[in-house]
Amino acid sequence: MSAYIALADGRVVEGRSRAPGTGRGELVFTTAYTGYEESLTDPSYAEQALTFSYPLIGNYGVREERFESDSVQPRVAVAHEFTEDVADWLEREGIPAIDAVDTRDLVTSIREQGAMRCGVAAGPDATPEQAKAQLEQCVEMSDHTDIGAQVSVDEPQVYEGSGLTVALLDCGAKKSIIDSLTARDAEVHVLPYDSTPEQVAAVEPDLVFVSNGPGDPANFEAAGEVVDAFAGELPIAGICLGQQVVARSLGGQTEKMEFGHRGLNQPVRDLDTDRVIMTTQNHGYSVADPGELAVTQVNVNDGTAEGLEGVGIDVITRQYHPEANPGPHDSLDFFDDVLEMAENHAPAMASD
C-alpha cells in the first residue's frame, strides 16, 4: 500500500503504508537506536511527525511496561523499516505509519532546513493530494496554544510515599519522572497543567516540580504563574519544558531551535566540575536567556543551556531527561539533588 509525506518545502516523499490513515504535524527526527516504545509514548512528541534515523524499528517487540504514557503520542511515525509488531501497534492506535523511506535524506532535509510542517496519507486509497490537504491544515507548534490539555491529567492524582511531598505540574509528564520520585519515597501529587497557585498550595508541597511537555513554553502560562508565586518560598525543579517554563517565569527568554535535540547521546558539560555526561533529550525549544538563574551545564555540541540553578533561591532545572527511559543513567542523581534541596529547605520554612 502506498503512502505519501507532503513537506512544507514543496516535496512529496513516497513510501509504504504500515498503518493506514491521514495525519499532520511538525516533522522531527530522533537519533535514538533503542527505546522506540518509550519515544512513541512520550507526551513531548504531541502534534509531531516522528522520524526514526535508526533503520530498523521494532527488533525487540512491544511491551507495555516500557510505555511512558497510555497511548502513542506523535501524530505520525516514519522509519526506514518498521517490524510487524510496531506496525500492528501503531495501526491499533490509529497512528499513520510509513516506512520504505530514505530516512537519511529526510533527516538531512530537517537538519538543513529545520523542523517543518508535513501532511501524511497512508493506505490503499492514499494519494499525494490527500497528503497535501493535510499539510495545508498543519500549523506551527507555537500555534497549538492549548496543547497542554492533550497531555495533562484532568484531575489530580496521588502516588503515595512516606517522604517529601512533591507537587508535579503535569505538562505532559513521562511516567519515568513519577517513578523516579516515588522510588525515593516521595509522595507525588500529579496536578493538571493549568492548576492555580492556590490549588498547588492546597497539597502543602515541599517541592514544586514542572514536568516535560510538548511545544512552546510560552503556551504554558499557568505553570509559569505557579513558579512565579512560589519562587523563593518553596524549592522549584523542572525538566525539559519545565526548565523553559521556570526560566521564562524568572525573567528569562526561550527560543525555537532549528531542529532541536532528540536522541540518547547528547553530551552535556557541567561548568563546575568540567565533567561530561551523556543524556537523553527531546525538545525543540531552549533557554536563550536564563534571566535570574545561573547556567550550570551546557550542551557540548551547540552551547545551549542544559542546567540552571537559582541565585539566592532554591531552583534546579535540567533541559535533558535525567530519568532517561530510554537512554543513559548518567544523571539520575538529579532527583536526589532536588529532594535534598527540598529537605534542606524545610527547616528554614518551619522557622519562619
Segments (PLM) and residue ranges:
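RNA-binding accessory domains that recognize and position tRNA/RNA substrates
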Residues: 1-165, 171-178, 182, 192, ...
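Generic structural signal for residues in well-ordered beta-strands
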Residues: 27, 97, 188-190, 254, ...
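Active-site glycine-centered loops adjacent to acidic/histidine catalytic or metal-binding residues
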Residues: 102, 240, 283, 321
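Residues that mark the start of a beta-strand
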Residues: 163-167, 187, 235, 278
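Short acidic loop-to-helix transition motifs that present clustered carboxylates
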Residues: 191-198, 216
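Cysteine-nucleophile active-site neighborhood
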Residues: 202, 207, 211-278, 284, ...
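Catalytic beta-strand/loop cores that center a nucleophilic Ser/Cys/Thr
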Residues: 274-312, 352
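A glycine-centered loop/beta-turn motif at secondary-structure junctions
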Residues: 308-349
